[in-house]
């Protein structure tokens, strides 16, 4: 079975979500430390996918569509190039507009502790990005 991986990119951490291509139901996957070392983050992501036995069809990355030529856009494009080299898969940029506010709204209703809130925020954003991909692109 093939899977699609979604990434919510950040300069400190990336949240990920995954779904198989049949039922298209995204679930939170893992949070990876970045700390401005994109290559290590990509390698850690690759190893985790491989060790967990997932066969990826493609990767989608949340991309801030309305921040023209921002530093985060440049960082995402650099990260995307590293992913393409390491995974040799199609990498699709998906508009992530309003995902942050949607995540905050969902998490507030969950009444989580601060530590759990921060951890869930990264993966839930990736889940929303993957849902958006299935609704609009797939």
Swiss-Prot record:
EC identifiers of the protein: 3.1.-.-
Any single Gene Ontology cellular-component annotation: cytoplasm
Record PANTHER family: POLYNUCLEOTIDYL TRANSFERASE, RIBONUCLEASE H-LIKE SUPERFAMILY PROTEIN
GO molecular function: nuclease activity
The protein's name in its UniProt record: Putative pre-16S rRNA nuclease
HAMAP family for the chain: Nuclease_YqgF
Lineage of the species this protein comes from: Bacteria, Bacillati, Mycoplasmatota, Mycoplasmoidales, Mycoplasmoidaceae
Matches recorded under Pfam families: RuvX
Role summary: Could be a nuclease involved in processing of the 5'-end of pre-16S rRNA.
Subcellular location: Cytoplasm
